[in-house]
């Protein structure tokens, strides 16, 4: 029997990534600390046992002809049954008991890296997969190593095999390699062509169905938690990451307090400099994280660790320490304190996300996500990791504001005596399995021999007459500057002309142009009369305060009708945002966004692009919420950030912003209340659950009369109410055949609700009723056998009934597998949304900010090739809206 070519290609990809390299040691079984815990012995030592077991010299002959290292391609081309491999089993030591003849049914396998030996279980199954399932099985094989990682527990491996047997029924009777067990290290190993390690035991399982029966019998047993490969550690750890063991980590808040207190000191004395240098050298801990030592717990948002050994903070700290040690010797005593403060400023800036592009701050989630490592004893941390990452972002933003306040704080002229760094000692999380000596010595205080420094009170030297004179001169100069700015800049307008340099400045007051005196207004260089003054046609600079009320645009091509239309649209948008009118936003968003993009082309300084992004995002989020009943925290955080930027640009919101309205509707969603109550009822037993379901149906019917339900609320109400009534009908029905049909229908409704609401609810009443009906049918079949039927007929009836029960069980397993696939897909989509939404929001804000900094289309009048606004001829082949249009922007250089 040949392996399907598609499956063979998938195995080649897996073997290329996870098999032992040619230079690797193939004779040792290692644990998580790379210490040998088992050896593969020579085949000669087991010849006597082999002869006693098989008494078949032909097997020995075939064994001796097989090379030591089989070619992987030849193994994958042929059926494993052509290689009757014999493992090194011990006749006196078996795990669970097994006959040795069954263990001879084996096959040639690849040699996988330590921790991935469970992949050997899938190699013999590959030969029994039908062509219709080849594509699905290939994807299953390729995804499994990344899904389980290295060293999963035995229960996880058995769950995977149960899932595979459900999806691919043809593999139930397929053979599997021997699974060895070491009673000393308490770990399993799926053997390959090297055999069983010496003195290891073997599991009583030679085929898939025997392995699944072991999974059913071992529920709750301790050995189900033993690792397949080694003890808990970080999977995918690289040698290049070993530097983290010696890196120095310190709590973020402790380092911030240390530097903040350092800014309040005078460093004219040697003892003060030594105290700060000693505090910096002793700050933090080493040996915080390693392959077998997990990063400290990150559930508390305030516990954030700073890696002092990574750039850029390590470079700034080195400069500060070097200056405290020797650099200050060439400076005057009066300048030393100022220079030390400047170095401390630079270190603080590296800790703030506002001043530094990269951050050295970590919590557990950021460390594991950034370095792509997985703690193999814990899985399914996706939602928890997302929450920890969001908490880290909020923490860094909050501390950045605090650092900014520290940097702007004026230093006190009073010198504090006997200063000691205020660094609270805090040890990282110590796990039970970690030795106590793994934690380094905590931060130490300043040396006790520091001599007190005298308190110096500086006398006041202020001159009030000089300050008054400076204030008067400043006011006069400010008035003159404002007058010149208005007279020489705001009154000038750009005018086009038909000759080089294509534009000219036409100065003068707009009111004088309309007065009618003095022999007429000025003429343009082209000899044409000046354009009559209309509101908003002159070029003006926008300020943050007047953007919301001033509709002037930086363009000379807009006529009065276009400007009036833009002004009317802009006022409608402001009114809809202020009143939080989602009806207007959903109805007019497409037209409003198009108008805002056109306005952004005319005025590069106004926040029209940012406003268009906000309207588009709000519309999509609100529509998605009404259809699915879900919106992520990351999406809401992005909208809150956009609203803050719009407020800074002069866009006013009402008491409740659109984002707050969506958040409140999500929190008060009727579907969420029904879902919570439905999950609570699913845990009840007996008649109480039936009564509770009926009460829930009545509550839903009452609340369905509300007119503010979303589409998702209506769908959830219909599904849950139908299931509640179906359960009531089942409890009132006495006909077994009718009950079975109703149970099937109710089970389908239950699976549908789990798919819609993202739950994993199983009503005990349905499962109990189903088991009761199946038991009655078996008993009835037995009763029929006692009515004079022949033994052959009785056996046929029993086989038919058993086959039907097995078919129903398989169908139920298929539905459960489909439900798990849907839940996994939903969870992956949620993870992608949590990770990508804040990144996209920040990228959009950055693009809009870069667009405004580039000047928008202020250089448009100097470039005749740029497209014109509506009402004028547009350049062929150029889109209407283009970001980064400014000629001086760095993206255009």
Swiss-Prot record:
PROSITE patterns: HC_PRO_CPD. It comes from Barley mild mosaic virus (strain ASL) (BaMMV). GO terms for biological process: proteolysis. Coiled coil: none annotated. It catalyses: Hydrolyzes a Gly-|-Gly bond at its own C-terminus, commonly in the sequence -Tyr-Xaa-Val-Gly-|-Gly, in the processing of the potyviral polyprotein. Belongs to the bymoviruses polyprotein 2 family. Residues 502-539 are annotated as: Disordered. This is Genome polyprotein 2. Residues 109-229 form the Peptidase C6 domain. The active site is at 117 (for helper component proteinase activity), 189 (for helper component proteinase activity). The lineage of its organism: Viruses, Riboviria, Orthornavirae, Pisuviricota, Stelpaviricetes. Pfam families: Peptidase_C6 (PF00851), TMV_coat (PF00721). It is an enzyme of class 3 (hydrolase). InterPro entries: HC-pro, HC_PRO_CPD_dom, HC_PRO_CPD_sf, TMV-like_coat, TMV-like_coat_sf. Residues 515-524 have a biased composition (Gly residues). The viral RNA2 of bymoviruses is expressed as a single polyprotein which undergoes post-translational proteolytic processing resulting in the production of at least two individual proteins. The HC-pro cleaves its C-terminus autocatalytically (Potential). Its EC number is 3.4.22.45. The record marks 229-230 as: Cleavage. Keywords: Hydrolase, Protease, Thiol protease. GO terms for molecular function: cysteine-type endopeptidase activity; structural molecule activity.
């Amino acid at each position: 029997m040949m392996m399907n070519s598609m499956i063979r290609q998938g195995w080649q990809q897996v073997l290329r990534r996870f098999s032992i390299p040619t230079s690797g040691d193939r004779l040792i079984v290692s644990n998580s600390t790379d210490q040998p815990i088992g050896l593969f012995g020579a085949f000669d030592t087991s010849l006597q046992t082999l002869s006693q077991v098989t008494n078949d010299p032909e097997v020995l002959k075939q064994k001796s002809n097989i090379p030591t290292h089989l070619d992987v391609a030849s193994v994958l081309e042929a059926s494993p049954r052509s290689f009757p491999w014999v493992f090194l089993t011990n006749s006196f030591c078996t795990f669970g008991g097994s006959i040795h003849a069954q263990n001879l049914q084996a096959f040639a396998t690849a040699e996988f890296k330590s921790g991935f030996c469970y992949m050997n279980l899938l190699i013999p199954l590959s030969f029994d997969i039908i062509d219709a399932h080849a594509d699905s099985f290939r994807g299953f094989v390729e995804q499994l190593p990344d899904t389980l990682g290295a060293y999963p527990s035995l229960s996880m491996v058995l769950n995977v095999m149960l899932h595979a047997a459900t999806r691919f029924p043809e593999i139930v009777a397929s053979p599997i390699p021997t699974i060895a067990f070491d009673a000393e290290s308490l770990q399993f190993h799926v053997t390959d062509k090297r055999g069983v390690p010496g003195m290891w035991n073997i599991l009583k399982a030679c085929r898939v169905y025997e392995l699944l029966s072991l999974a059913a019998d071992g529920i709750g047993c301790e050995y189900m938690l033993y690792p397949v490969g080694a003890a808990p550690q970080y999977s995918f750890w690289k040698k290049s990451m070993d530097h983290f063991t010696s890196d120095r980590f310190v709590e973020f808040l402790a380092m911030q307090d240390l530097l903040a207190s350092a800014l309040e000191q005078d460093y004219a004395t040697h003892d003060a400099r030594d105290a700060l240098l000693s505090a910096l050298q002793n700050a933090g801990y080493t040996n915080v994280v390693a392959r077998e030592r997990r990063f400290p717990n990150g559930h508390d948002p305030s516990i954030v660790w700073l890696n002092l050994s990574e750039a850029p903070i390590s470079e700034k700290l080195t400069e500060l320490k070097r200056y405290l040690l020797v650099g200050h010797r060439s400076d005057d005593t009066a300048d030393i304190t100022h220079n030390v403060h400047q170095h401390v400023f630079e270190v603080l800036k590296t800790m703030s996300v506002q001043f530094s592009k990269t951050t050295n701050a970590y919590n557990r989630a950021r460390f594991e996500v950034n370095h792509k490592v997985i703690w193999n004893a814990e899985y399914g941390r996706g939602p928890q990791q997302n929450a920890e990452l969001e908490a880290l972002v909020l923490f860094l933003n909050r501390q950045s504001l605090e650092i900014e306040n520290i940097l702007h704080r004026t230093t006190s002229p009073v010198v504090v005596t006997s200063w000691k760094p205020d660094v609270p000692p805090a040890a990282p999380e110590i796990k039970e399995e970690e030795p106590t000596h793994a934690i380094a010595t905590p931060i130490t205080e300043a040396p006790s021999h520091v001599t007190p420094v005298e308190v110096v009170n500086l006398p006041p030297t202020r001159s009030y007459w000089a300050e008054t004179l400076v204030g008067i001169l400043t006011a006069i100069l400010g008035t003159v500057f404002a007058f010149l700015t208005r007279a020489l800049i705001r009154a000038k307008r750009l005018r086009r002309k038909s000759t080089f340099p294509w534009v000219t400045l036409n100065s003068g007051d707009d009111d004088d142009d309309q007065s009618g005196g003095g022999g007429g207004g000025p003429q343009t260089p082209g000899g044409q009369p000046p354009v009559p003054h209309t509101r908003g046609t002159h070029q003006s600079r926008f300020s943050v305060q007047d953007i919301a009320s001033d509709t002037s645009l930086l363009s000379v091509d807009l006529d009065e009708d276009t400007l009036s239309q833009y002004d009317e649209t802009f006022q409608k948008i402001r009114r809809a945002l202020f009143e939080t009118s989602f009806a207007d936003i959903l109805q007019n968003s497409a037209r409003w966004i198009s108008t805002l993009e056109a306005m952004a082309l005319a005025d590069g300084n106004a926040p029209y692009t940012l406003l268009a992004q906000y309207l588009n995002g709000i519309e999509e989020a609100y529509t998605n919420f009404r259809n699915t009943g879900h919106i992520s925290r990351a999406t809401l955080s992005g909208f809150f950030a956009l609203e803050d930027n719009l407020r800074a640009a002069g866009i006013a919101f009402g008491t409740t912003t659109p984002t707050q309205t969506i958040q409140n509707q999500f929190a008060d969603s009727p579907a969420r209340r029904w879902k919570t109550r439905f999950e609570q009822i699913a845990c009840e037993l007996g008649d109480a659950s039936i009564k509770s379901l009926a009460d829930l149906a009545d509550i839903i019917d009452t609340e369905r009369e509300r007119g503010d339900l979303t589409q998702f609320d209506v769908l959830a109400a219909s599904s849950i109410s139908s299931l509640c009534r179906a359960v009531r009908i089942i409890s009132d029905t006495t006909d077994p055949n009718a009950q079975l049909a109703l149970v099937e229908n109710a089970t389908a409704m239950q699976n549908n609700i789990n798919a819609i609401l993202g739950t994993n609810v199983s009503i005990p009443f349905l499962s109990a009723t189903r088991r009761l009906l199946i038991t009655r049918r078996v008993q009835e079949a037995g009763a029929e056998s006692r009515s004079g039927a022949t033994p052959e007929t009785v056996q046929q009836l029993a086989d038919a009934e058993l086959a039907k029960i097995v078919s129903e069980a398989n169908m139920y397993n298929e539905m459960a597998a489909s439900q798990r696939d849907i839940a996994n897909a939903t969870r992956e989509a949620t993870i992608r949304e949590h990770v990508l939404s804040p990144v996209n929001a920040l990228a959009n804000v950055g693009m809009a900010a870069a667009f405004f900094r580039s000047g928008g289309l202020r250089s448009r009048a100097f470039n005749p090739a740029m497209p014109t606004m509506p009402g004028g001829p547009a350049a062929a082949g150029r889109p209407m809206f283009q970001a980064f249009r400014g000629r001086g922007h760095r993206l255009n250089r």
